[in-house]
């Protein structure tokens, strides 16, 4: 097995990744070590199979969809920069960063709106900008498994879509999705404290 150093300078494009993700150098170093540990064959990239070894994703009902987010546009590999970018959505929001942020700069990946966009994409499988009843049903089925009957699940799905669908088109747009989650503390629910 090759040498695995603990120096942040060994991370390719570390400064750009730090700017894009908002992770500190210490957090990036921890993530890089995790990336290397998952890359058991030292290929320099991760495959879906590598990510399926993460226990928290293996037991998460949306684990496969979260793993899919690491591989946009049908790619089969994720390099460290892409790995860090996806995990940045789960970085806790630092209120100091929010007040000091330059409004001319793009919103950080871990902002409330970007966390909501990430969550929305877990539902919007066909990427048409709307969550159809069928897409909602698929996600709810993953989340509840066999704990409810198909009839109950159909009813829950219909009620969920109906409550969020303000324009009556039978689907949930991103704005409707965001509005339906206004009162939810998405910042806390989509945060991994160990990465701070």
Swiss-Prot record:
It comes from the Eukaryota. GO terms for biological process: cellular response to calcium ion; intracellular sodium ion homeostasis; positive regulation of calcineurin-NFAT signaling cascade; positive regulation of cell population proliferation; positive regulation of phosphatase activity; positive regulation of protein import into nucleus; positive regulation of transcription by RNA polymerase II; protein transport. Keywords: Calcium, Cell membrane, Cytoplasm, Lipoprotein, Membrane, Metal-binding, Myristate, Nucleus, Phosphoprotein, Protein transport, Repeat, Transport. GO terms for cellular component: cytoplasm; cytoplasmic side of plasma membrane; nucleus; plasma membrane. CDD domains: EFh. Residues 26-61, 111-146, 152-187 form the EF-hand domain. This is Calcineurin B homologous protein 2. The gene is Chp2. It comes from Rattus norvegicus.
């Amino acid at each position: 097995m090759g040498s695995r150093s603990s120096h942040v300078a060994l991370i390719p494009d570390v400064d750009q990744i730090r700017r894009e993700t908002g992770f500190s150098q210490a957090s990036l170093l921890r993530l890089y070590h995790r990336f290397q540990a998952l890359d058991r064959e030292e290929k320099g990239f991760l495959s879906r199979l590598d990510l399926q070894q993460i226990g928290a994703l293996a037991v998460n009902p949306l684990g496969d969809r979260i793993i899919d987010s690491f591989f946009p546009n049908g790619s089969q590999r994720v390099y460290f920069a892409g790995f860090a970018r996806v995990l940045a959505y789960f970085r806790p929001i630092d209120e100091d960063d929010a007040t000091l942020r330059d409004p001319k700069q793009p919103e950080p990946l871990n902002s409330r709106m970007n966390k909501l966009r990430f969550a929305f994409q877990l539902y919007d499988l066909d990427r048409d900008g709307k969550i159809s009843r069928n897409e909602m049903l698929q996600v709810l089925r993953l989340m509840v498994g066999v704990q409810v009957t198909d009839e109950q699940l159909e009813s829950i799905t219909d009620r969920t879509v109906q409550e969020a669908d303000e324009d009556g088109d039978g689907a949930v747009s991103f704005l409707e999705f965001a509005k339906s989650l206004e009162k939810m503390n998405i910042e806390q629910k989509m945060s991994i404290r160990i990465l701070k």
